[in-house]
């Protein structure tokens, strides 16, 4: 008897790539998805056989692709970043923008909330990392020892006893920053291509990075060293740790690989069955991943504008 993933359904509603998905333990029947259609959709999960969820509300306001979205820990607010160069804070009860964050000179590629929701970090194509308060005031711009190329992803560690930010960029580097003084703690060197994503484990002890070279590299955040590398075999667009299993999920081109980190083995590989009329048609790429808070459901966003929903099931292999 092994755990495996079963496709449960899809969420249809976007008219552009699904760039990010956010879940919250406060509201297990709600998820948010960001898209290149310039909107964020708030979904009500019905878990019906035919339709896994219905679009309840579209958050509109960005004038270009929405690149990232996260939900505050109380489930009341969402934070988004866009290629229009701004961040927006949304009140999820009303669906309105409560703050616009202006300061980046180019596309915002990534946004994150600190665990206490008091600080916000953003990464941009202007090669800077900015720290903001929730009132929309930029408190600090990291330029010293910053990335020499686009900053593709920024994340806070959830561990409040080790307050750090992890970033990655198109300069192939993973950087760890001390949140107290915004100074560089560690440069993690090893990737051979540009990086798309970095994610921190739920306990804050390690992080994983991935991008063009198809390698998921794992780094020890306490010791500041490289642990091991998992071969994804294709460009890595997104990475996320399971909230309750020692698993790492990677969006590798059109498929999703799930590794058990204890044995460093693949638990499952998720591919969507594409009935293609021409063999030259490229299958949709997986661009975003998010687990439900209970770790039983995996949401995946794709370049065919769909969110596919997979569930952990017990099966016989």
From Swiss-Prot:
Changing residue 127 to A: Decreased binding to PTK2/FAK1. The modification Phosphoserine is found at residues 276, 278-279. The modification Phosphotyrosine is found at residues 52, 228. It is a peripheral membrane protein. Changing residue 130 to A: Decreased binding to PTK2/FAK1. Changing residue 60 to A: Decreased binding to PTK2/FAK1. Scaffolding protein involved in the recruitment, assembly and/or regulation of a variety of signaling molecules. Interacts with a wide variety of proteins and plays a role in many cellular processes. Component of the 40S ribosomal subunit involved in translational repression. Involved in the initiation of the ribosome quality control (RQC), a pathway that takes place when a ribosome has stalled during translation, by promoting ubiquitination of a subset of 40S ribosomal subunits. Binds to and stabilizes activated protein kinase C (PKC), increasing PKC-mediated phosphorylation. This is Small ribosomal subunit protein RACK1. It comes from Homo sapiens (Human).
């Amino acid at each position: 008897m092994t755990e495996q993933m079963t496709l449960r359904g899809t969420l249809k509603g976007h008219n552009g790539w699904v760039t990010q998905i956010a879940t919250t333990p406060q509201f297990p029947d709600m998820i948010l998805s960001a898209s290149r259609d310039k909107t964020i959709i708030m979904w009500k999960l019905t878990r019906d056989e035919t339709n896994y969820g219905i679009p309840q509300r579209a958050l509109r306001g960005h004038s270009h692709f929405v690149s990232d979205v996260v939900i505050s820990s109380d489930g009341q607010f969402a934070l988004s970043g866009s290629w229009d160069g701004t961040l927006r804070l949304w009140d999820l009860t009303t669906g309105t923008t409560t703050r616009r964050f202006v300061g980046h000179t180019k596309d915002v590629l990534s946004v994150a909330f600190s665990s206490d929701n008091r600080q916000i970090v953003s990464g941009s194509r202007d090669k800077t990392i900015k720290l903001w308060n929730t009132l929309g005031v930029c408190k600090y711009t990291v330029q010293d020892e910053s990335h020499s190329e686009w900053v593709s992803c920024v994340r806070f560690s959830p561990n409040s006893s080790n307050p750090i930010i992890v970033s990655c960029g198109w300069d192939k580097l993973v950087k760890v920053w001390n949140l107290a003084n915004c100074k560089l703690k560690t440069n993690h060197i090893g990737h051979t291509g540009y990086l798309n994503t970095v994610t921190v484990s739920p306990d804050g002890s390690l992080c994983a990075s991935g991008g063009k070279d198809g390698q998921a590299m794992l780094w020890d955040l306490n010791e500041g060293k490289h642990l091991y590398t998992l071969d994804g075999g294709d460009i890595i667009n997104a990475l996320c740790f399971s909230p309750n299993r020692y698993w790492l999920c990677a969006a590798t081109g059109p498929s999703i690989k799930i590794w058990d980190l204890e044995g460093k083995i693949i638990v499952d590989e998720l591919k969507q069955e594409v009935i293609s009329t021409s063999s030259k048609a490229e299958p949709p790429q997986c661009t975003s991943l998010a687990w439900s808070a209970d770790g039983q459901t995996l949401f995946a966003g794709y370049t065919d504008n769909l969110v596919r929903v997979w569930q952990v099931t017990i099966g016989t292999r």
